[in-house]
């Protein structure tokens, strides 16, 4: 690669004044544009999408988050609670009624079906460069998607692209790549 020569020529790293563009508003705008543009619909075998308040007004939100992320050997807390609140606010702003709480018991399927028009499972599991995959871990058995055959269910992965292997029963799956 000739990195040693570039270093000798002073061309390996940009000059300090050229580094000032990193994190600039222009770069942040480009990042937002890329994040919006590259969301991928992986599958929608039952035509659940798009979701609309007139058809899917009552949404049951299931939000899966991890333990944080490891950077330089240190466990860092993630911002899952903020991401979850953002999802709820955005859905409510569009006219949806969103219910989200930890589920401790399954209950009766008929009651669940009467109560919700759609289930939205948001997967915000975050890793870092040392992981090439993060497997989904359900905190309790009742959190597993037992309802997918009865209630339209859309899964959205916010970070890793390979969660579908853990939820083969998913009829609708979206990769969003980032949680912003």
Each predicted region: which residue ranges?
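Preference for extracellular/luminal or secreted protein segments
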Residues: 1-180
């Amino acid at each position: 690669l000739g990195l040693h020569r570039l270093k000798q020529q002073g061309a390996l790293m940009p000059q300090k004044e050229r580094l000032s563009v990193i994190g600039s508003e222009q770069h942040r705008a480009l990042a937002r544009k890329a994040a919006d543009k590259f969301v991928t619909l992986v599958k929608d075998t039952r035509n659940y999408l798009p979701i609309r308040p007139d058809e899917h007004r009552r949404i049951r939100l299931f939000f899966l988050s991890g333990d944080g992320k490891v950077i330089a050997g240190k466990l860092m807390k993630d911002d899952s609670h903020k991401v979850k609140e953002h999802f709820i606010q955005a859905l409510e702003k569009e006219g949806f009624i969103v219910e989200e709480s930890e589920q401790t018991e399954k209950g009766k399927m008929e009651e669940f079906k009467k109560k919700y028009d759609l289930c939205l499972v948001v997967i915000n599991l975050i890793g870092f460069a040392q992981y090439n995959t993060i497997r989904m871990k359900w905190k309790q058995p009742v959190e597993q998607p037992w309802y997918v055959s009865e209630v339209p269910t859309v899964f959205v992965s916010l970070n890793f692209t390979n969660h579908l292997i853990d939820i083969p029963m998913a009829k609708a799956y979206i990769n969003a790549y980032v949680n912003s």
